[in-house]
Amino acid sequence: MADAKELKQVLIGPIVSNNPIALQILGVCSALAVTSKMETALVMTIALTAVCALSNLFISLIRNHIPSSVRIIVQMTIIASLVIVVDQVLQAYAYDVAKQLSVFVGLIITNCIVMGRAEAYAMKTPPMMSFMDGIGNGLGYGAILLSVGFVRELFGNGSLFGIEILSKISDGGWYQPNGLLLLPPSAFFLIGALIWIIRVMKPEQVEAKG
């Protein structure tokens, strides 16, 4: 049984020191597509965290009974089933957001973070640790999404969660929104800037040369 210190490290590590996007450069494609608004970034964070945590838990519970030759198929079946459930819940209770997220909820099944944690961690680790690892990696993914979404929506549209924060010139205010921030390439540059800032602050994350 894992102690509290180990559980805390597994939960906090992916958010701070081993972020799946900032350090491992995983899950970048969806991060580019769903961060034009805080609302979509938050819902995608919740969806991926739920899938990652629950898939880790279920895979860990049956890890000793999965033949090595079919382990990837079993993992993908579990992940796909959870993605279908999450997608149906969103369709039922957050239809407008589900439409905005489009295919990206369904594509969680191919997300490198979810598949990577299932194979590299859940297959070798007890259920509780695997569950916490899934939550930690989901929150680490979400931290980057929400940071990028905050900048893009605030300065690209003058709002947060659809609520006007900066009064726009078109409405008689003072702020001229930067439409470039709402385009997908801006997310790429913002994520790159975040990675650079993190590695300046944490030099140990810079890859060794040679």
From Swiss-Prot:
Protein name in UniProt: Na(+)-translocating NADH-quinone reductase subunit D
Keywords: Cell inner membrane, Cell membrane, Ion transport, Membrane, NAD, Sodium, Sodium transport, Translocase, Transmembrane, Transmembrane helix, Transport, Ubiquinone
GO cellular component, one term: plasma membrane
Compartmental location: Cell inner membrane
Transmembrane segments: 10-30, 42-62, 72-92, 103-123, 131-151, 178-198
UniProt keyword annotation of Repeat present: no
GO terms classed as biological process: sodium ion transport
